[in-house]
Each structure stands twice: as structure tokens, then as C-alpha cells.
């Protein structure tokens, strides 16, 4: 049974004596910039659900005074913590709304929000007001954001970059003990999920379907550099999509020819496109002339996964656990 990270980490008791204290001023390299913290922040605004959930997982919910950019419900176990924190916006907050909370740090998931072309604000704008910013390394390392938008990933995502974010945020807030314990817990959970299905011997393959602009349009499928590719690789599963794009559109005829052992379908709370609805995804797969003949569909090997687990965040581990459990309960690895 999974429990809220903070329940394990924040109550870690005697573990604190083993971790070093942060010495201020602390200077870190973040997304190509030197960022200096004069002291542990007491007021944080997090512009991004992943960043928010990491702060909560480090037991820092009482330091978060505002959040924004939500894709779905908060990580299970943090409902009460999150209910006490002001939500500045479900999507993009304004620069002024962030400043109104008098933050001592602004964290962000994406440079699209806080970066050289940030639509919320540029790091320099905040720093001129004495507010340091910290953007998730997973949006900078092995990724080119110079073209704006979602950017282009240039190297495969690895969980180590999330562990770097956890470790650095723990250092910034002087809670290194919690950071060390959280990273250790996540690594142990990934190892346990791998063990659950043992060796797949390279015999399994998958296609990960995020959504489609129209239900009969080419689907957005996970390429080989994003978080879903890491989930598959962690379990020894081949990704049939070879594109270096993070979410390329690929025709169903092409996917059918690659004959994946399974289809992993994203569950989204948003309803931007009809295919965001997981029920609509299943109806399409079972009714379309091409997809209904795919062995993955006819054999019942279409597995649901929370879309948040497909983001470059600590929820990737939950995605690995979910898929491992689905495979273990099926006849795929027998």
C-alpha cells in the first residue's frame, strides 16, 4: 500500500542527525543560472503541480503560500495539506498574483512559465525584487526550450534528474534528511515494482497513448525520450515508437503494424479533446476497424495509467508500479 510521501519522510525522526546542515548563502546552478539563497525560504509559491507535490513530499506544505498550473487532483495523501494552500490559478498565474503572496522563492515545473521566455515571469524579473527562482532540472537538462512551447527533449529522461530536484530543494530549505529519505524510498519502490514482474526477457512491447485532437485522428504517442519511455524501459518493455519527439503523432495503421504487446492509455481529468476521456479511448480501440483487430486490444491488454505518471516527476514511480501490477495480473509475462 502506498502512503503519502510526507507521512514517511516528514516523520523521519532520528534520521535528521545524519544529514548535513545547509550553510547560507547557498548558491546552486539551476537551468544555466547561478541562484543564491541567503536563508531557508519561509514562503514559497510553486508554479507547477510536480514542484508543489515535491515540496509537500518534503514536509514543506506549511511553507507553500500559493500554487498554480494543475493538471489533476493532488497526490493522494496531501488533500488536507493542499486544501490549506491558496490556489492562484488552475493554469497560468499572473506575475502580479505571484508577487502578491510575498514569496521568498518561486519554483516552477517549466521554463515556459518561469524562464528566458516565461509567460509568468523571467528569473531576472523576480531576482530584481530579491526573489530567487528554481525551475525543475527535468525541463532544462537534456532539453532544448529555445523554440518556446513544450520544448524538445534531446536526451532520454532519467529519474536521476528528479532526484536532483528533490535533493536541491531539500538543501535550499535545509531539510536534507527528508530529501535523502524520499529519494531512498522512491528508489526502493522502483526496485520492488521491477521485482514484481521479474525479467520480461525483452519479449514485451508497448505503445503509450496520451490523447488525440479528434478521436479518429492520429494519436499522440510517447516517443523514446520522455517519462513514459523510462517507465517502459524500467520494466524491460520495448517502446514501439522510435521517434525522438516527446509526443509525436503516429497513425494507427503504423502502430498496428508494429504489433505492441500492450497499449498504455492515459487517464486525464481535462476535457480538451474527446480522447482525453479514458472511456472514449477504450470505445475507440474496441470499435475502430484497425485497432479492434490488434492483439493488444482483442486480448484485453489495454492498461490505464494516470496522465500525471507520464510527466517528468516523482509520479513516474507510481506509473512503474501501476504498469507492473497490471502486467502481473495479466497473462503477458507467463
Can you annotate each of these PLM segments?
Residues 43-116:
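A short, structured surface patch at a secondary-structure boundary
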Residues 50-53, 70-73, 105-106, 111-116, ...:
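Solvent-exposed loop/turn segments at secondary-structure junctions
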Residues 72-74, 218-247:
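Alpha-helical, coiled-coil/dimerization segments enriched in small aliphatic residues
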Residues 156-165, 264-334:
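Structured C-terminal subdomain patch of bacterial secreted/periplasmic proteins
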Residues 73, 113-121, 131-168, 201-227:
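Extracytoplasmic ligand-binding site segments that recognize negatively charged/polar headgroups
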Amino acid at each position: 500500500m502506498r502512503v503519502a510521501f510526507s507521512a514517511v519522510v516528514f516523520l523521519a525522526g532520528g534520521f535528521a542527525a545524519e544529514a548535513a546542515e545547509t550553510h547560507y548563502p547557498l548558491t546552486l546552478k539551476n537551468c544555466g543560472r547561478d541562484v543564491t539563497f541567503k536563508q531557508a525560504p519561509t514562503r514559497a509559491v510553486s508554479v507547477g503541480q510536480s514542484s508543489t507535490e515535491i515540496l509537500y513530499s518534503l514536509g514543506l506544505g506549511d511553507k507553500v503560500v500559493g500554487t498554480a498550473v494543475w493538471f489533476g487532483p493532488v497526490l493522494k495523501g496531501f488533500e488536507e495539506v493542499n486544501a490549506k494552500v491558496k490556489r492562484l490559478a488552475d493554469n497560468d498565474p499572473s506575475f502580479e498574483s505571484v508577487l502578491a503572496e510575498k514569496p521568498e522563492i518561486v519554483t516552477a515545473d517549466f521554463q515556459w512559465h518561469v524562464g528566458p521566455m516565461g509567460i509568468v515571469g523571467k528569473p531576472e524579473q523576480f531576482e530584481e525584487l530579491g526573489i530567487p527562482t528554481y525551475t525543475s532540472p527535468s525541463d532544462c537538462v537534456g532539453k532544448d526550450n529555445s523554440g518556446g512551447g513544450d520544448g524538445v527533449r534531446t536526451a532520454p529522461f532519467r529519474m536521476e534528474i528528479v532526484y536532483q530536484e528533490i535533493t536541491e530543494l531539500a538543501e535550499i530549505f535545509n531539510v536534507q534528511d527528508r530529501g535523502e529519505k524520499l529519494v531512498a524510498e522512491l528508489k526502493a519502490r522502483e526496485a520492488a515494482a521491477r521485482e514484481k514482474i521479474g525479467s520480461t526477457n525483452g519479449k514485451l512491447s508497448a505503445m503509450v497513448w496520451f490523447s488525440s485532437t479528434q478521436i479518429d485522428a492520429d494519436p499522440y504517442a510517447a516517443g523514446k525520450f520522455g517519462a513514459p519511455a523510462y517507465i517502459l524501459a524500467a520494466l524491460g518493455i520495448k517502446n514501439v515508437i522510435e521517434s525522438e519527439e516527446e509526443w509525436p503523432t503516429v497513425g494507427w495503421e503504423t502502430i498496428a503494424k508494429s504489433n505492441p504487446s500492450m497499449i498504455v492509455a492515459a487517464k486525464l481529468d481535462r476535457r480538451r479533446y474527446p480522447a482525453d476521456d479514458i472511456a472514449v479511448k477504450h470505445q475507440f480501440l474496441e470499435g475502430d476497424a484497425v485497432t479492434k483487430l490488434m492483439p493488444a486490444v482483442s486480448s484485453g491488454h489495454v492498461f490505464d495509467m494516470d496522465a500525471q505518471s507520464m510527466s517528468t516527476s516523482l509520479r513516474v514511480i507510481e506509473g512503474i508500479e501501476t504498469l507492473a501490477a497490471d502486467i502481473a495480473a495479466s497473462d503477458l509475462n507467463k
